């Protein structure tokens, strides 16, 4: 999309026609988060970038903001992000943050470690931050940041990729999944934990099956549905609109 105010525009999904301010041109059953190209934001254009994002955040399908530290060599609490955090607070939408491993070797893990979320969470206590991928493989650190900060939640997307057979998956990833289970129990608050897929990198039915074996059954309804509807607060109206 083209810039209207001279700032950096969001990275958008490409499932529909180009963005239009009147109709937004999004499929009726799709919600999305605006992607942030942090390296393109400067002190000079940070406020203008927030204005660009505000155009999109008014879209009923826009559920939040997504940062990509690690892929961008910018820490979560860098001041260039602050106007976006203020925008998230004003519109009551969460800020999701890529954490943990990166998909290619050029990514820099010091920026994507889940401990980096702590500083932003303390500086902006009225903004909800979502640690995407549970900080994989740093589950302990992600759980501690979420445990310490009332405004931090976790999603379980993209932990295992591909399409292995279920029993092979459990056998191959037994220790990995045991650690995940241990640290989710350490957090102890399953209202802070959300299912996520990272589609198309995962087989959705298999991934649901895997997460259902990690999360105690009594919390399935919260982890697979209720928490996302509460944390991404615009989902409810979107579901009503779609008849869901």
Map each language-model feature to its residues.
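Mid-to-C-terminal alpha-helical segments outside catalytic/metal-binding sites
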Residues: 1, 181-182, 186-194, 201-244
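Short, conserved catalytic or adaptor-binding loops enriched in Gly and charged residues
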Residues: 19-25, 145, 183-187, 215
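Catalytic pocket-lining loop regions of alpha/beta-barrel enzymes
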Residues: 62-64, 77-194, 242
């Amino acid at each position: 999309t083209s810039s209207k105010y001279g700032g950096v525009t969001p990275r958008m999904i490409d499932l529909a026609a180009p963005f239009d301010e009147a109709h937004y041109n999004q499929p009726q059953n799709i919600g999305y988060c605006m992607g942030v190209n942090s390296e393109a934001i400067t002190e000079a254009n940070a406020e203008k970038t927030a204005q660009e994002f505000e155009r999109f955040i008014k879209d009923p399908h826009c559920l939040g903001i997504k940062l990509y530290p690690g892929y961008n060599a910018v820490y979560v609490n860098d001041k260039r992000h602050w106007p976006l955090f203020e925008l998230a607070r004003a519109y009551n939408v969460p800020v999701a943050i890529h954490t943990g491993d990166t998909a290619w070797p050029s990514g820099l893990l010091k920026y994507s470690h889940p401990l980096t979320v702590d500083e932003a969470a303390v500086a902006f206590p009225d903004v909800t931050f979502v640690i995407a991928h549970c900080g994989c493989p740093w589950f302990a650190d992600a759980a501690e940041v979420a445990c310490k900060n009332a405004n931090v939640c976790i999603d379980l997307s993209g932990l295992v990729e591909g399409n292995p057979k279920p029993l092979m998956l459990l056998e191959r990833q037994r220790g990995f999944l045991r650690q995940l289970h241990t640290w989710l129990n350490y957090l102890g608050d399953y209202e802070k934990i959300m299912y996520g897929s990272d589609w198309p990198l995962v087989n959705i039915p298999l991934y649901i099956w895997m997460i259902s074996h990690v999360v105690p059954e009594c919390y399935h309804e919260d982890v697979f549905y209720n928490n996302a509807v509460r944390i991404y607060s615009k989902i409810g109206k979107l579901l009503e609109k779609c008849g869901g």
